[in-house]
From Swiss-Prot:
It is an enzyme of class 1 (oxidoreductase). Belongs to the NAGSA dehydrogenase family. Type 1 subfamily. InterPro entries: AGPR_AS (IPR023013), AGPR_type-1 (IPR000706), NAD(P)-bd_dom_sf (IPR036291), NAGSA_dehydrogenase (IPR050085), Semialdehyde_DH_NAD-bd (IPR000534). Its EC number is 1.2.1.38. It comes from Shewanella pealeana (strain ATCC 700345 / ANG-SQ1). HAMAP family: ArgC_type1. This is N-acetyl-gamma-glutamyl-phosphate reductase. One of its GO terms (molecular function) is N-acetyl-gamma-glutamyl-phosphate reductase activity. Catalyzes the NADPH-dependent reduction of N-acetyl-5-glutamyl phosphate to yield N-acetyl-L-glutamate 5-semialdehyde. It is found in: Cytoplasm. Pathway: Amino-acid biosynthesis; L-arginine biosynthesis; N(2)-acetyl-L-ornithine from L-glutamate: step 3/4. One of its GO terms (cellular component) is cytoplasm. Pfam families: Semialdhyde_dh, Semialdhyde_dhC_1. The keyword Amino-acid biosynthesis applies.
Length: 329
């Protein structure tokens, strides 16, 4: 039985992974934590999320004493905290010998030069960063098992990279174009005008300036054009990706490329049949659908995930299971 501490448990992602870990026979929750300044400290999780009424745990303030208790009694810590908060917490817990599963972007880039531009801070822990592994579960399982510092990918990169990485050897210099729509939960739980009921519509945001663009490009090994959109639904992501493939590429080449997922428990691939968000919401699955025009050499692949599950919490759980040698289903 592995004991997991969850920090940032009051947010959508933190609450979601609390629910997932609570349902695992071989994992237990060491405790739920929020910042000492949080208005939610001391509250039962079920007060914030009545759907989790079966979880009788309260949100504890993350004091210095609480941190020492975590080190003494937990095997791993999940960080569902802001990037700048995770930067320090992840390094501290890692240096104490715990396995760290960080859901922020604080350890996703291996290059320290990326952080001032995309996250607004200078990375203070280059050695910890050097040890970090990008937790794209279907692709980096050996590294996830071998390290104690796992940077869980962003939601848009997860949807995009699962679709594109099998094709990396078939891509040309023409940049892949990724148009992706996310549910409102992707913007977090904090009240904001643009995510309020009367304001939500369908609109692009972060155009040519979203931090997930370089994350996707770094992991793919090729620049991309990425445009995220905020949709008028609660949860889920649909990424529709257009790519130019090398001259002479055939349907058989693409079919063979996607055979890499034949044994993947959580990825489904279909040709000439496209996924919809409703089919993956509240699940840890990624559904891919693709179609290829041999005359023009263009392929369109669509990728659907739940942004809070495969795009965050359930992928973190995958990484936890891989790291501790549990089967992933």
């Amino acid at each position: 039985m592995k004991n997991i501490a969850i920090i940032g448990a009051s947010g959508y992602t933190g609450a979601q992974i609390t629910s997932l870990i609570n349902a695992e026979a071989n994992l237990s929750i060491q405790g739920l934590y929020v910042s000492e300044s949080s208005l939610d400290k001391g509250k039962p999780l079920s007060e914030l999320y009545p759907a989790y009424s079966h979880i009788s745990l309260c949100l504890n303030p993350l004091s210095e004493d609480a941190k020492q208790t975590i080190v003494a009694t937990a095997d791993a810590v999940v960080l569902a905290t802001d990037h700048a908060v995770s930067l320090h917490l992840a390094a501290w817990f890692y240096q104490q010998g715990l396995a760290v599963f960080d859901l922020s972007g604080a350890y996703r880039f291996s290059d320290v030069a990326q952080y001032p531009k995309w996250y607004g801070f200078t990375h203070e822990y280059p050695q910890v960063l050097a040890d970090a592994v990008y937790g794209l579960a279907e692709w980096n399982s050996d590294q996830i098992a071998a390290t104690k510092m796992i940077a869980v990918p962003g939601c848009y990169p997860t949807a995009s990279l699962i679709a594109l990485k099998p094709l990396s050897h078939l891509l040309t210099d023409v940049l892949p174009v990724i148009n992706a729509v996310s549910g409102v939960t992707g913007a977090g739980r904090k009240a904001q005008l643009h995510t309020s009921f009367c304001e939500v519509s369908l609109t692009p945001y972060g155009v040519l300036a979203h931090r997930h663009q370089p994350e996707i490009a770094t992991q793919l090994g090729q620049e991309v054009i990425f445009t995220p959109h905020l949709g008028n639904f609660k949860r889920g992501i649909l990424a529709t990706i257009t790519v130019k493939l090398k001259p002479g590429t055939t349907l058989s080449d693409i079919q063979q490329a996607y055979q890499c997922y034949d044994s993947a428990e959580l990825v489904t691939v279909k040709q000439n049949q496209f996924p919809k968000v409703d089919d993956v919401v509240q699940t840890p699955h990624c559904h891919l659908g693709w179609k290829f025009d041999e005359q023009t050499g263009y392929l369109v692949v669509a990728s659907a995930i739940d942004n809070l599950m495969k795009g965050a919490a359930s992928q973190a759980l995958q990484c936890i299971k891989i790291h501790f040698g549990e089967s992933v289903k």
